[in-house]
C-alpha cells in the first residue's frame, strides 16, 4: 500500500481528507502539530481563552478521536520555537516597519510546507503528504519533459485557499495531495455527517494561523507598545490621537475614534507615516486616495514560465481577481499596472498572480502609486 501522511488539525477539513484517502486505499498516518503556547509566548492581553483549557489541546483531543474513529496512527510534533522565530517575529517586524503582513501565508511557507514536511519526510518517509486545504495541484511539462506541479484553484471558489499558498516554491508542492480540491465545503460537511465523524459540526477555525481569535489591538500591544500620535486629514487638519500607526491598515474604517467628527460619510485610513507617527484619514469609501493604479512587488516566488505579461492579480483574500500588466524589474521584483484602479492596495500584503485558474506565484506589495505619484502608505 502507498503511504500518505495527513496533517490532522482537529478540524473537519483535515478529518475528511484523511477519511477520503483511507477510502481510496492508501496507508494513512496522521500528524498533529502545535505551534503556539500562550504562556510561553506572553499572549496575555486580548486572549479570550487564557483561563480556559488550551484550545490547541482541545484540537489535539479532537484529532485523537478522529484518528481512533478512522483507525489510523496519530503522531504529535511541536513547532512552537520555529513558529515564533520564522513566522511570528517576522509578523511583528513587519508591523514595526509600518507594513500589514499576512501571518497565514508566512505560516504555510515556513511551518506547514517546510518544517512539517521536513519532519514527516525524515521521521515517517511517506510517498505523499496530504493537507486539508481547498486547492488543487496539476502537473505541466516544461523543459526536458519533466513534470512540474502547479497550484490550481479549488472548485469551491468561496473557500479557495490558493491565495494563502501562493508563495510556496515548486519544490514545496512536490508529492503534496489536496483531497478536498474538487469538493465544496457543504460536500465536506455532508461526508463528515454521513460517516459520523466526531467533528462534523465543529466550527471552522478563524483568526491568526495557529493562534486563533484575538482582540487585535490588545494582542499586538503584548509585543508592540502603543505609541500615541496624531490623526490628520491629508491637508494637515488635526482631528484626534491614535494608539500607534502600526495598529491600523489602509482602508480601515472601524475603531478610529472619530465619532465626534462623524457626518454622512464615514472616515477611512488613507495613509500612514512612520517617521512622524501620523495617521491620515479622509471621508468616504470612494475617496481618490484610497485607490491606486500601479504597485511595486518584491520577494517574488514564481512557478513556471515568465513569458505571460498579462495576468490577473489578487491583493487580499476573497478579492475578485483584477487584470494586471507585468513588467519584470529583476528576478525578484516586478511592477504591475492595473487599468481598473484598485482600492486599499496595502504595503506588506501579498499580491498573488493567476493565469485563469492557475496560481503562478506571488510577492510582497512594496510601494503603491497613482498616476506616477507614490502613495504615503508607509
From Swiss-Prot:
Pfam families: tRNA_Me_trans (PF03054), tRNA_Me_trans_C (PF20258), tRNA_Me_trans_M (PF20259). The keyword NADP does not apply. ATP binds at residues 7-14, 33, 132. The active site is at 107 (nucleophile), 209 (cysteine persulfide intermediate). The record marks 133, 349 as: Interaction with tRNA. It is found in: Cytoplasm. CDD domains: MnmA_TRMU-like (cd01998). Signal peptide: none annotated. Keywords: ATP-binding, Cytoplasm, Disulfide bond, Nucleotide-binding, RNA-binding, Transferase, tRNA processing, tRNA-binding. It catalyses: S-sulfanyl-L-cysteinyl-[protein] + uridine(34) in tRNA + AH2 + ATP = 2-thiouridine(34) in tRNA + L-cysteinyl-[protein] + A + AMP + diphosphate + H(+). GO terms for biological process: tRNA wobble position uridine thiolation. GO terms for molecular function: ATP binding; tRNA binding; tRNA-uridine 2-sulfurtransferase activity. Disulfide bonds join 107-209. Residues 159-161, 316-317 are annotated as: Interaction with tRNA. Catalyzes the 2-thiolation of uridine at the wobble position (U34) of tRNA, leading to the formation of s(2)U34. This is tRNA-specific 2-thiouridylase MnmA. The lineage of its organism: Bacteria, Bacillati, Mycoplasmatota, Mollicutes, Acholeplasmatales.
Amino acid at each position: 500500500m502507498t503511504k500518505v501522511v495527513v496533517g490532522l488539525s482537529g478540524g473537519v477539513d483535515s478529518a475528511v481528507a484523511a477519511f477520503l484517502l483511507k477510502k481510496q486505499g492508501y496507508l494513512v498516518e496522521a500528524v498533529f502539530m502545535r505551534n503556539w503556547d500562550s504562556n510561553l509566548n506572553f499572549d496575555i492581553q486580548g486572549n479570550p481563552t487564557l483561563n480556559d483549557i488550551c484550545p490547541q489541546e482541545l484540537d489535539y483531543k479532537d484529532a485523537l478521536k478522529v484518528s481512533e474513529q478512522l483507525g489510523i496512527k496519530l503522531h504529535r510534533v511541536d513547532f512552537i520555537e520555529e513558529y515564533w522565530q520564522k513566522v511570528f517575529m517576522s509578523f511583528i517586524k513587519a508591523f514595526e516597519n509600518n507594513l500589514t503582513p499576512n501571518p497565514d501565508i508566512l505560516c504555510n511557507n515556513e511551518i506547514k510546507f517546510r518544517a512539517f514536511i521536513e519532519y514527516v519526510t525524515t521521521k515517517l518517509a511517506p510517498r505523499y503528504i496530504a493537507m486539508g486545504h481547498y486547492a488543487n495541484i496539476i502537473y505541466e511539462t516544461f523543459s526536458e519533459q519533466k513534470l512540474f506541479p502547479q497550484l490550481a484553484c479549488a472548485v469551491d471558489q468561496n473557500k479557495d485557499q490558493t491565495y494563502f499558498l501562493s508563495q510556496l516554491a515548486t519544490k514545496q508542492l512536490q508529492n503534496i495531495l489536496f483531497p478536498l480540491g474538487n469538493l465544496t465545503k457543504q460536500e465536506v460537511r455532508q461526508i463528515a455527517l454521513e460517516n459520523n465523524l466526531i467533528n462534523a459540526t465543529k466550527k471552522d477555525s478563524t483568526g491568526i494561523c495557529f493562534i486563533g481569535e484575538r482582540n487585535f489591538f490588545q494582542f499586538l500591544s503584548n509585543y508592540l507598545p502603543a505609541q500615541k500620535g496624531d490623526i490628520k486629514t491629508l491637508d494637515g487638519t488635526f482631528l484626534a490621537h491614535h494608539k500607534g500607526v502600526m495598529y491600523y491598515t489602509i482602508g480601515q474604517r472601524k475603531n478610529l475614534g472619530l465619532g465626534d467628527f462623524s457626518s454622512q460619510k464615514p472616515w477611512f485610513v488613507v495613509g500612514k507615516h512612520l517617521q512622524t507617527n501620523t495617521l491620515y484619514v479622509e471621508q468616504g469609501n470612494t475617496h481618490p486616495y484610497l485607490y491606486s493604479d500601479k504597485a511595486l512587488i518584491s520577494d517574488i516566488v514564481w512557478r513556471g514560465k515568465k513569458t505571460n505579461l498579462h495576468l490577473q492579480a489578487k491583493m487580499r483574500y476573497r478579492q475578485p481577481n483584477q487584470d494586471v500588466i507585468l513588467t519584470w524589474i529583476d528576478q525578484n521584483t516586478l511592477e504591475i499596472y492595473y487599468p481598473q484602479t484598485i482600492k486599499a492596495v496595502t504595503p506588506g500584503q501579498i499580491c498573488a498572480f493567476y493565469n485563469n485558474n492557475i496560481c503562478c506565484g506571488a510577492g510582497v506589495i512594496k510601494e503603491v502609486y497613482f498616476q506616477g505619484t507614490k502613495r504615503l502608505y508607509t
